[in-house]
């Protein structure tokens, strides 16, 4: 019964309502409930394609990519999603962190440093996150001296 409802929703989204972001998000949730993670990820990708500036769709897509293992190491697709999130929400901590990681991973330590300094400036100095970012920045400095 549930499978049939999800199949009908998928058919409607694919054939009649491709620009309906909320429909794609509903379909992704339905696929997730059914433990069909690949199809959920594809539906979230369609939601982002339908409206690349929709923060909730971007965040859901980023979370799904992260769950699929695309955040360690950071995949180009995950980094692109984080860049899109920054366009909508320039102070998004998670996007700043992962874009710094991607920049470091691709050898652009200057860009990594910029992302992480911006992130660290937003965090309370007594927080664990602040110190984690500080350690990442120190790691960049040490790597640059070797």
Model-derived features: positions:
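TPR/TPR-like (Sel1-like) alpha-helical repeat modules
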Residues: 104, 109-127, 138
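Register position in tetratricopeptide repeats
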Residues: 33, 67, 105, 136-143
């Amino acid at each position: 019964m549930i499978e049939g409802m999800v199949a009908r929703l998928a058919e409607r989204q694919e054939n009649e309502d491709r620009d309906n972001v909320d429909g794609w998000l509903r379909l992704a949730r339905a696929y997730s409930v059914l433990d069909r993670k690949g199809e959920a990820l594809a539906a979230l990708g369609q939601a982002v394609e339908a409206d690349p500036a929709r923060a909730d769709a971007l965040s859901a897509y980023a979370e799904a990519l992260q769950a699929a293992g695309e955040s360690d190491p950071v995949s180009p697709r995950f980094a692109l999603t984080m860049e899109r999130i920054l366009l909508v929400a320039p102070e998004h901590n998670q996007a700043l962190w992962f874009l710094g990681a991607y920049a470091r991973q691709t050898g652009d330590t200057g860009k990594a440093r910029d992302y992480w300094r911006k992130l660290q400036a937003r965090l309370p100095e007594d927080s664990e996150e602040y110190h984690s970012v500080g350690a990442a920045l120190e790691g960049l400095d040490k790597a640059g001296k070797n």
